Every structure is written in structure tokens, then in C-alpha cells.
From Swiss-Prot:
Main location: membrane
UniProt-listed PANTHER family: ATP SYNTHASE SUBUNIT ALPHA, MITOCHONDRIAL (PTHR48082:SF2)
HAMAP family for this protein: ATP_synth_alpha_bact
Protein name (Swiss-Prot/TrEMBL): ATP synthase subunit alpha
Organism: Rhizobium etli (strain CIAT 652)
Keywords: ATP synthesis, ATP-binding, Cell inner membrane, Cell membrane, CF(1), Hydrogen ion transport, Ion transport, Membrane, Nucleotide-binding, Translocase, Transport
Enzyme Commission no: 7.1.2.2
Localization: Cell inner membrane
Catalytic activity of the protein: ATP + H2O + 4 H(+)(in) = ADP + phosphate + 5 H(+)(out)
Recorded GO MF terms: ADP binding; ATP binding; proton-transporting ATP synthase activity, rotational mechanism
Source lineage: Bacteria, Pseudomonadati, Pseudomonadota, Alphaproteobacteria, Hyphomicrobiales
PROSITE patterns: ATPASE_ALPHA_BETA (PS00152)
Coiled-coil annotated residue ranges, if any: none
Bilayer topology: Peripheral membrane protein
Amino acid sequence: MDIRAAEISAILKDQIKNFGKEAEVSEVGQVLSVGDGIARVYGLDNVQAGEMVEFPGGIRGMALNLESDNVGVVIFGSDRDIKEGDTVKRTGAIVDVPVGPELLGRVVDALGNPIDGKGPINATRRSRVDVKAPGIIPRKSVHEPMSTGLKAIDALIPVGRGQRELVIGDRQTGKTAILLDAFLNQKAIHESGPEGEKLYCVYVAVGQKRSTVAQFVKVLEERGALKYSIIVAATASDPAPMQFLAPFAGCAMGEYFRDNGMHALIGYDDLSKQAVSYRQMSLLLRRPPGREAYPGDVFYLHSRLLERAAKMNDDKGAGSLTALPVIETQGNDVSAFIPTNVISITDGQIFLETDLFYQGIRPAVNVGLSVSRVGSSAQIKAMKQVAGSIKGELAQYREMAAFAQFGSDLDAATQRLLNRGARLTELLKQPQFSPLKTEEQVAVIFAGVNGYLDKLPVASVGKFEQGLLSYLRSEGSAILDAIRTEKAISDGTKGKLTAALDSFAKSFQ
């Protein structure tokens, strides 16, 4: 057998040359105590605030309390498999989630892991969940409408792209239904509209029943709206840290569209439950409680989240992220801690009332208490032309209706005002899952403010509206097209619309 020393030595030298000299260094700590989703860890001296750490078995956690002798870690998952003395590793990464168009049509948890059984998500980009909101210079004032398809909102409390509009009300008043209709209303733009106007939707479910989230996803899927939506779900059975993180994760996914010159709409449903889970974490981390036992920084929790919704200027791509946070009140009490906080952070609120809901006024929007601080700059000119008068008339109607309860002998002008107000209130009702295009809303409200409903019985208003819309879609499509393209009611269009209304009103019985 021929042994070649030179060859063997060459192989050995090659092996030695490639031998790794660096030992793998990872900073580790030990679990001192664990319980209620919180672990106290000794060691990890150089850990960053908000850094992801790893427990045995691949369970992740986030370092929130950095104290002199230990680190308070919240656990993203079950703490049953973690025990005292376990080794905890630093990952060196701040909590981040996958972002990008690959997530559209998917249901994910607060860490961006798919939970819909449709296989892995092949997203190439990741983004930190908690980033700084854009400053003042990169922003632009809100000036484009974000149409929800609901007459009561688009006419009276308009929402613009880049705005934060709070949806607030007691349980079972239709808060989620408003978000759902706003999502469904984007379908027409996605199917035929220009690329620059498409609005991608993100729905964050915090602390909801799984059946409720499944129902929401089912409706989106059945109506063809899931393909441009992302669902982030941290349900009631998920640990508090996941419920706390979900809105930030959803926001990071929405920011991808905002920062790439596209438009996104995000609904947080709801931030009351996020505040409750944050309170739970803070108390277990032994942070001092404040009002209603919430920690002192619960205002900052919501403000840093909602400030990330913005309209960017043209240099930054002119994208936008619109936020519709939801807050659940107890017994219509908007003066509680969390409702007042979020009202002061947002650019207006849509106030829903149980009484209106049970009277059959749905969406149950209290027009008197609801405001949009962006106002008519988020409306097209055509909507401003018809909505200006409806606001005034409804305000007068509410005032008069209060007095009319006491006196029976009313003069003709007051009676006329009450009649008109009752019909306009009826006109603003809208069944669920039937959002209207802006030009259709304009035509319907035009009929209302120009007296076409005054002679009808209140019960026939809905029937009149349905008939009018069918008539305009078939006979008067040119009028609707003109309103859509001109974005205003010109004198010519006004004449045609009046003629169409006259001919329809004659035939309507």
C-alpha cells in the first residue's frame, strides 16, 4: 500500500486551516421564578429593553423590566414548560414580524406566525413591531377621502386617508360591523380602480372569541375581501403579552404599505382589551399602578401606537396608514380612563349608542356626539355640496325634537323641519354588508336635502332609496359616472339629476 506523506500532510494542513478558532459565545441567564406568564431571570446583563429572549423548547419572551439584580421577561406562549433553573438565551434581536404583500389573505398571530392552516408565509422582509412614528416634516395634512361606504359616516363624520378615527360604544352596538363594512367597501377599488387608490386592510383582533374572529374571516372570504386583507389575531385564550403585542404587529404590517407609497387601513378591535392585558403584565411585573390600576404609561402605550397612522408627503411616496381604533365603554361612560385617553389621541370619534341600535337606527351613530377633526377636507366636492345642508338640518331637528315633546301646537316651519329631520334620519339607516359608492351616496342625500322625501311616509324612505339606486344604475348611469369623474355636482349634472329624480318620484308609488 502506497502512503503519500505529502498528500496526507496537505489534507491535515487544510483541515487545520479551516478549523474554527472562535468559540460560540451566547449570553445566557437562569430562570429564578416563573408564573402568570412572567419569568424573573438572573444574568443577561447586557439585554436590551424589548429584546426577544429564548427559553428551552423554543418558547420566546420579551425583556420588559431591566432591574439591578434580575430581568422581568413576559412569555409569548405557555409558561407551563418553563421551570426554575432553566437556561434563557439572548437572541440579540428586538421583537419583529414579517411584513409585505405575502401576508395578504392570511391569518397570523401576534408574532406573524400563520394560524390559518394555509402553509408557511414566504415573506422576505421583517420589521420591528415598535418603531418611532414619523416626524412632522415627512407628513402631509389629510386631504384624500377614505370611503367607508356608510352614508352616516361619509357624509357627516368623514374619515380621510392618514386619519385616526375612534369607533366607541358599548358592547353589541355594531362597532366591528363598521370596520367590516369599511373593509368590504374597498373591493370595488381593488377590482377596477387605479393602483394608487387601492387600500389594503389590516384587522387586529385583541382578546376576542375565536368564533367571532372566524366569523369575520368567513365574511371577508365569502365577499372576496380577504385577498387584500391581513388578519392579526390574539384571541381571549392567548396570553396577555400576545394581546399586548398584536396591535403593534398589525401596525408594522400596515406601515409597510404606508412607507412604500401605498395606502392601508388598520382596525384595532379593541384597544380596551389591549390596555387590560398591559395592566395585567405591568401589575405582575410589580410596576406601580395608577388610576383604575392601569400603569402610568398606558397613555403612552396608545399614543405611540396611534401616532404611527399618518399621511406621508410626496417626497416620502405619498402613502398613508389610516387607523380605526375601537374602544368598548361600560354603560355609555366615555369619561372613564381609557376612553378619554384615546379620544384625546385620535382625530375624532364615531360614537355608537345602544338606544339608537335598539330603535333600529343602524349604524347606531349618534351624529351629535360624533366628530371628525379633519372634517370636509376629507370629502370630495360633490359630497361637501350635499352634506353641508344635511348636517345643519339634522342639528336643528335634534334641537326641535327635544322641544316638540312638550308642545303640541307647532307652527308650520317647525313641523316641516321635524318632518324633514325624521326622513333624513331614516335615510341614513343602512343594512350591514351593503356599502354604497360615493356617487350613489351623493345622489341619495341630494334627494333627501332637496325635499324629494318630504311627502313620503317615513316607512317608505328605505324603499324609495332602493328604487332610486336601481333606477340610477340602469337609467342614470351617466349621471353617476359624471359625479365620480368630476368629483363635483356641476350645473349640468345637477339639472340631469333633478330631472331623473322628478321622473322617478312620479313613477314611485
